[in-house]
Amino acid sequence: MNIPYGKQTIEEDDIQAVVEVLKSDYLTTGPHVGAFEDKVKNYVGAKYAVAVSNGTAALHAACYAAGIGPGDEVITTPITFAASANCIRYCGGTPVFADVCADTYNINPQDIERKITEKTKAIIPVHFAGQPCDMDAIHEIAKKHNLIVIEDGAHALGAEYKGKKVGTLSDMTTFSFHPVKPVTTGEGGMIVTDNPELYQKLLLFHSHCITRDQSLMKGYEGPWYY
């Protein structure tokens, strides 16, 4: 038996949609990206969505928006793709691995509690194979220790936790549109959030801090007008 790594369903209307973009004035960013962001945020029930080039970039952007930097520790799972830990390193933080539950392969909240130190800044739970983690327990820990929660929902677009779609539960949630994910754009990623301050930071990160909003043009890191 030959089981494919991934098999996509590409139909004629998909091809025509790509042709439409290729014939338009926008090969990047553009109105189609904005429409896609709107569809995803409306589908999951979030207030804001920011599209990026892939799921790894989504995690990187979320860590940046969360203010993770040198000296910070972020707890995540070792049973995941490397990006779930690499995104922490990209921002100068240190990944700390908590063990998983034997029945779900999702991160174990009890071990999260054991791994918390005075340096812990955030938790990145990964919904293994699209199966949501025990978010109630994770949020209880995060509230107790004043931690940010970034859900890695790469495989979990459409998944629900106690009647709520993944993407509405935590400070930020990231999705991937790689060919082996529930929805694919070839490559692609997205971050959703209900927090307007995090949203502005995500927008700046995704556009190299370029903005035409003068109210945002302050601070050491930029932004800059383009």
Task: Identify what each model region corresponds to.
Residues 64-153, 160:
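PLP-dependent aminotransferase-like
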Residues 26-73, 87-91, 97-99, 164:
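Phosphate-binding glycine-rich loop
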Residues 51, 76, 97, 182, ...:
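Conserved SAM-binding loop
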Residues 1-27, 31:
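N-terminal "arm"/small-domain region of PLP-dependent enzymes with the aminotransferase-like
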Residues 156-162, 169-226:
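Active-site region of PLP-dependent enzymes
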